[in-house]
Amino acid sequence: YRGLKKKAGKEEDWANYKSYDLFQHAFKILQNAMYGTYAKNGWRYTDGYLICSAAITNSGQRLDQESINFVNQKLNTELNTDKNYIKLADTDSMYIELKEVIDTKYGIDLTKEERNQKILELAQEIQDAANTNLDNISKDLFNIKPGTHYFQLKQEVICTGLLTTGKRRYAMYVTNKEGVSVEELDMKGLELMKSNMNKLFKKFGEDLIKNILFGKSKYEIDNSVIEFYKHLKTLDPKQLGKPTGVKQISEYHLPPRAGEMFSSFRTKAPANTKAAVRYNDLLKFKKLDKKYESIIEGDKIFIINLKPNVYKLETIGLPNAKVPDEIEKFVKEFIDIDEIFESLLLNKLKELYKDLGWEFPALNENITKFFKF
C-alpha cells in the first residue's frame, strides 16, 4: 500500500493517495497487534515467559541503535566533525539533521525545491549504506544471510523544522512525504493538540507551533499570544466554549423542588450534564422552553465559564441550535474569558514556553498573577 500511495501522490491522485495511506496505516496497526499477541499468555504460540515478545522489542531497539551509531559515524567521518546528527529517534525510526551536510556539499544558495531534491538524494545514499550495515548486523547478531531478512530503513519525510520537548513529544513541519511534496504539521504528545480544544484554540495552537518551527522570534510569538487573547474578547461565546456531548442528563438530574428555580444533581454529576441542565432551567425560568428547544441527551453543546452573576451559575451549556436573545445577552455579559483562556490554553502555552526556556509574556494583571515562570 505504501508503494501505491507514493505512486498516487506523484500522479497527484489525492483521492487514492488518502485511501492507500489509510490502508497502510491500518495494516501497520494490524502488524503491531500481531506482535502484541506474543505477550499474551492465552495465545497458543506464546511461550508464557514473554521471551518472544521481549525478543521482538529488543531486536528492533538494537537494530535502531546500531543504525543511529552507524549514521552518526558516517556523517562525522565525511564532515570531520564530532556531533550528534540524530535529533529524534524512536524504537523504529530516526530523524537526521542534514542542513550542515547540504550546506557543506552544495552551498547555501539552493531553492526549496533544489534543497529537497538534494536531501532526497542524500537520504537515498544514507539509506543504502545503512541497509548494507543492517545486512552485516543481521549476519553477526542473528546469523541471517543478507537478502533473506526483512530489516530495512526507508526515507519517509523531509521537515523544515523540528521541535522536541520530551519523550514522544514533538512537532515537525513536513514538506515531503515518501517522495511526494506536502505541507503538513505533524505533532505528537503536545498539549496544544489535545482533543478537548475547540477549533479556535486548536487553530491558534497549530499556527503558533508553525511560527516557532519557521524560526520566528520570541518577540513575534509573544505578540501573537497577546493579540489572540485580546481578540477573544470580541468573539461570539460559542466560539469560546469547550465542545462536548451530553449523555447522562436523566441519570444525574433531579428536578427543582417547589419554589426553586434550578435543578439539583446526584453525586458526581459530570460538568457537561450540569451545564446542559442549567441552560434548560434558564429556558423554563424565562418561559422560553415552549419556543426554543431544550438540550437533550445526544446533543452537542459548548460549555461556557461564567463570572459571578445573579443566578450564581458557574457554567452554562449553549446548544448548536438558536439561543434566545435574553440568554445570549446574559452569557455575553458574564462570560469569563480569563477563566476560559486559563482552562483551555494558558497551561498548555505555559508548558510550551517552559520547554523552550522562555518567559511567558504579561497579558494582564489578573491572568498572570497565579502563573509565574
State what each model feature region is.
Residues 3-9, 32-44:
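Active-site-adjacent bridging/hinge elements
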Residues 6-19, 23-28, 48, 57-91, ...:
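DNA-dependent DNA polymerase catalytic subunits
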Residues 40-55:
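Gly-rich Lys/Arg/Thr-decorated short loops/hinges at beta-loop-alpha junctions or inter-strand turns
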Residues 35-42, 86-95:
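Core alpha/beta catalytic barrel or barrel-like domain that forms the active/cofactor pocket
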